[in-house]
Design a protein with these regions (language model features):
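Hinge/lid segment of periplasmic solute-binding proteins
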Residues: 35-60, 126-187, 350-357, 423-427, ...
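C-terminal capping/gating helix-and-loop segments adjacent to ligand/active sites or protein-protein/ligand interfaces
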Residues: 171, 366, 415, 430-485, ...
Length: 489
């Protein structure tokens, strides 16, 4: 118990240090207006306090109950634990309804098709919700630009520019549909203890350094190391594991996301128009699936998936994460939001983290962040209450708690906080270096955000699944993708 309390105290002190660092080194001093006050009682600092006009009544929405539909991830988990602090100040009760990815997608589809306003706060996936239902989301400019209301701490400029463009806008920047909430990216998880133990033997047999954090760690080396581990597991020499690697391969959104990182690492892309992967578009463009880079990436992805122990129905991201956390695999490609589960599992303290292996062009790490938006079909009173919640839920204090908590560990969406974390926590938290690098422009990859995103992903998932199961080869997959996309447009 004493050890636990010591860790809690250390984490709280660390939070104060980071916020102080932000004030002194990561942000410009901001003059507090005489007619605005801070709230929620956090330590006063020039970057992090939520402000409102002196006459603003924080309890004007007291008694209102909001339903927030959200994916069950680290951010939602921490928010569920912290939300009583928001209720205590405002009198607004928020039910954070966490659910798995597929259920979330189904319920949000039903919500906007029926226009029932069953959920007031929406977890806005830019590739599933923003691209299709932006007209059902409230324009948050109405609240952010209203001088009589609390505003986003630090303003919209405090968020990563590219993440803001992906999560908050559609086609143009006229309307703000959501505020960046989480910022997960694909990274490589690996059993550091196993790699250290067998490093010399791997070097002797493979002829290269197998370290996944090496700048020379390519997809070909990933494949070579995985095969080496599989062979030594089968021979009985390596008893700590069951598999060299696990890669997402089910007929599920996960296979498309896993392939996307491989595609970009070999210099490929889905479309030529850069707006498709940023602000998004209602227009459908010609797909590049017949390009040399695309076909090469398909072939390489099939090689990677073939390392999985058996095909069956394939693996989703949850199944891959569960197997790795149980100590079965040496490496996995997955979202960094799995760090909490991994570091609270039987492999805790034994795991290393890196950006994904390089293709012929670069290491490419798929971005998967989302925002929080307000249902435009909710009542005006609930919309105001929802805005107050968003201001609080995306504040620096809450985002830092999400990073520092035992069940947390993912990066905030604010540029200054990420910079501070990189400077202060790279040694203490083994995942920080990989997470920060994965979001850098030279390593990050943003997938298409289109009005017809559902149709596009359906085509990709179906053909990738058929290919990795051996029903079609990479050439046929590339032809099918192009012809099926053309037919739907």
């Amino acid at each position: 118990m004493q050890i636990h309390n010591y860790k809690v105290i250390n984490r709280m002190l660390a939070l104060i240090i980071v916020l102080t660092l932000i004030v002194t080194g990561c942000s410009k001093p901001k003059t507090q207006s005489e007619d605005r006050i801070e709230f929620f009682g956090e330590p006063k600092n020039e970057f992090g306090n939520i402000e409102a006009p002196n006459e603003f009544d924080w309890r004007q929405c007291e008694g209102i109950k909001l339903n927030f539909i959200c994916e069950d991830n680290i951010n939602a988990n921490i928010l569920s634990k912290e939300v009583e602090k928001f209720t205590k100040v405002t009198g607004i009760k928020v039910n954070v309804k966490r659910m798995d990815f597929n259920t979330l997608e189904e319920k949000i589809n039903m919500e906007f098709i029926s226009k029932t306003a069953q959920y007031d706060l929406i977890y806005v996936d830019p590739y599933k919700t923003l691209n299709r239902f932006y007209n059902g989301l409230e324009d948050l400019n109405k609240y952010e630009k209203d001088d009589t209301l609390p505003h986003i701490v630090g303003g919209l400029d405090s968020f990563s520019t590219e993440q803001l463009r992906v999560c908050s806008y559609f086609e143009n920047t006229d309307k703000v549909y959501s505020i960046p909430f989480d910022s997960t990216t694909m990274i490589l998880f690996y059993r550091k203890d196993v790699f250290q133990q067998y490093r010399d033997q791997m070097i002797q047999d493979l002829g290269y350094d197998p370290d996944p954090e090496s700048t020379d760690f390519t997809w070909d080396r990933f494949i070579g190391v995985s095969k080496w581990i599989n062979d030594h597991v089968k021979s009985g020499e390596l008893k700590e594991l069951k598999y060299g690697s696990l890669t997402m391969s089910a007929k599920h959104n996960s296979i498309y996301t896993a392939f996307s990182s491989v595609l970009s690492s070999y210099g490929g892309d889905y479309f030529r128009n850069s707006r498709v992967v940023s602000l998004g578009t209602s227009t459908s463009y010609e797909i590049l699936s017949r390009s040399t880079e695309f076909t090469k990436a398909l072939k390489k992805f099939k090689e990677i998936v073939n390392l999985n122990p058996d095909m069956n129905e394939g693996y989703t991201w949850d199944e891959v994460a569960n197997s790795f956390s149980e100590g079965e695999a040496a490496m996995m490609i997955n979202w960094d939001e799995n760090i909490s589960a991994v570091e609270n599992s039987q492999v805790a303290g034994k795991v290393g983290y890196s950006i994904l292996p390089k293709g012929s062009v670069r290491s490419s790490n798929l971005y998967g962040g989302s925002g929080i938006g307000v249902n435009s079909y909710a009542s005006s009173k609930k919309k105001l209450a929802a805005w107050l919640f968003i201001v609080w839920a995306t504040s620096p204090q809450v985002q830092m708690k999400t990073f520092l908590e035992k069940d947390g560990g993912t990066l905030p969406t604010r540029t200054a906080l990420v910079k501070a974390i990189d400077q202060q926590y790279s040694k203490e938290f083994p995942q920080v270096r990989a997470m920060v690098r994965s979001q850098m422009p030279e390593y990050a990859y943003y997938r298409p955000k289109m009005k017809k995103g559902y149709e596009f992903e359906d085509i990709m998932i179906s053909n990738l699944y058929e290919m990795v199961r051996g029903k079609i080869d990479e050439r046929k997959a590339s032809i099918n993708i192009k012809s099926q996309w053309t037919a739907r447009n």
